Amino acid sequence: MNKLQNIRGVAFDLDGTLVDSAPGLAAAVDMALYALELPVAGEERVITWIGNGADVLMERALTWASQERATLRKTMGKPPVDEDIPAEEQVRILRKLFDKYYGEVAEEGTFLFPHVADTLGALHASGLSLGLVTNKPTPFVAPLLESLDIAKYFSVVIGGDDVQNKKPHPEPLLLVASRLGMTPEQMLFVGDSRNDIQAAKAAGCPSVGLTYGYNYGEVIALSEPDVIYDSFNDLLPALGLPHSDNQEIKND
């Protein structure tokens, strides 16, 4: 807990930390797969693919769907499908479809987790500088933050297209710290996944791991963050601010 004593700013992951984006992501993935006449995956499975950016999400979806189709065809006594299109091109096509569909469903399929809005407001009001670091494609980030009414809290926002190396590489965290005008040691990073904690460690930032997000089926403790919290508003007393017990509901 000593690492939180000299904090001047806080940066956050987005998906699985501030927002439950799985409904929108899963819907877009399934619509893209369906458009290519591939099996659809469903939200429970898509959740396990979230966290490394859209291209990796497409690779995971395509790998699963291709294997699932092969299994189904074998069960029905049908021959396997000959793929004339290289795997890289299939991923590109799937990504293009995903971007189209996600643009249509992102806002209605993304919800703030409990206590996020009031906690961000309290942190911002306290004078702490706030940043956002996400592997989500950059064009989707700003509209989503605006629709959820939390864009006003962030001085710096880094999306997946704004850096050459996404998390778990330290580059995006180092960039946020630099733009916030502080050292990595002065910036707390809050996330829900192995990638988040690895990025924080590599950048030299103290880290908070949240237990409720998307972490590939792993408990966040295995990544050894400096602090682990079950609720987002536990950040407030840790940073010397009054604890908020206001319960929020998902946005409509």
Swiss-Prot record:
GO MF term list: metal ion binding; phosphoglycolate phosphatase activity
Major enzyme class: hydrolase
Subunit record text: Monomer.
Function: Specifically catalyzes the dephosphorylation of 2-phosphoglycolate. Is involved in the dissimilation of the intracellular 2-phosphoglycolate formed during the DNA repair of 3'-phosphoglycolate ends, a major class of DNA lesions induced by oxidative stress.
Keyword Cytoplasm recorded: no
Chain's gene name: gph
InterPro entries tied to this protein: HAD-like_hydrolase_sf, HAD-like_sf, HAD-SF_hydro_IA, HAD_2, HAD_sf, PGP-like_dom2, PGPase_prok
Catalytic residues (UniProt): 13
One GO BP: DNA repair
Family named by the database record: Belongs to the HAD-like hydrolase superfamily. CbbY/CbbZ/Gph/YieH family.
Keyword line: Carbohydrate metabolism, Chloride, Hydrolase, Magnesium, Metal-binding
Positions with a binding annotation for Mg(2+): 13, 15, 192
Entry's EC annotation: 3.1.3.18
Gene Ontology terms: cellular component: cytosol
Pathway recorded for this protein: Organic acid metabolism; glycolate biosynthesis; glycolate from 2-phosphoglycolate: step 1/1
Co-factor(s): Mg(2+); chloride
Catalytically driven reaction(s): 2-phosphoglycolate + H2O = glycolate + phosphate
Name this protein carries in UniProt: Phosphoglycolate phosphatase
